[in-house]
Amino acid sequence: MPDAKDVILKHIAAVNDRDSDADPWAADAEIVAPGGRASGRDDVIGFLSVFHEAFPDLRLEIKQLLSDGPGAAAEGTLTGTHDGVLHTPNGDVAPTGRAVVLRWAAVYVTDGDTLKSEHLFFDQMDFLGQLGLLPG
């Protein structure tokens, strides 16, 4: 049985390569993140594609990855340039051209070689500030 770390590393590589076919999400996967959630493989991939559209050069880097059985936790950075439209629950944000470096953490549950769930955490205020969307 694959180690949870291997599944997470495959997921991160698929995100960085923009290869949704290689992303190991399970058919009944779930993602929960600031500002939204999605259930089911297709909806999860659609949820993540919002970030690819907004940040065409998006890259995820893991700084630390821990696992125990089917569970894993990671911390890392997201880098990218806001050169595309960012679709949010409150409306679309036009490209700002700003580069962001966003710290994130996630808790994962795997099942064999698939990713069942991700609970993603990041500082929304930091994110909005880097995009120049806060008064100030």
Describe every region a protein language model picked out.
Residues 1-136:
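C-terminal and inter-domain tail/linker signature
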